[in-house]
Design a protein with these regions (language model features):
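C-terminal structural segments of small proteins and small subunits
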Residues: 45-76
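Intrinsically disordered, low-complexity, charged/polar segments
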Residues: 4, 17, 73-76
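A structural micro-motif recognizing beta-strand termini
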Residues: 18-22
């Protein structure tokens, strides 16, 4: 099943298919290592859903949930 990364349920592994964000954000995500083919797991969402913690490449980072809408992933 394909969804945007902001809608991926907690704890479900997925693979990044596309990073379709604005150039500046796309570069930032690429610098973190979030590129097509990367396996990612959503680990935490703040109570107001404004921040999401992601685990990928042995790292956990927290990003604004709204910034993840342009990232398409496929559940395994």
């Amino acid at each position: 099943m394909q969804v945007s990364l902001d809608r991926l349920p907690l704890g479900i592994p997925a693979v990044v298919l596309q990073v379709g964000c604005k150039q500046e954000l796309r570069c930032r995500l690429r610098d973190f290592g979030l590129v097509p083919g990367t396996e990612v797991v959503t680990r935490y969402r703040s109570p107001d859903r404004g921040v999401t913690a992601l685990e990928f490449r042995d790292t956990v980072i927290a990003l604004r949930t709204r910034d993840l809408k342009g990232v398409r992933v496929e559940w395994k």
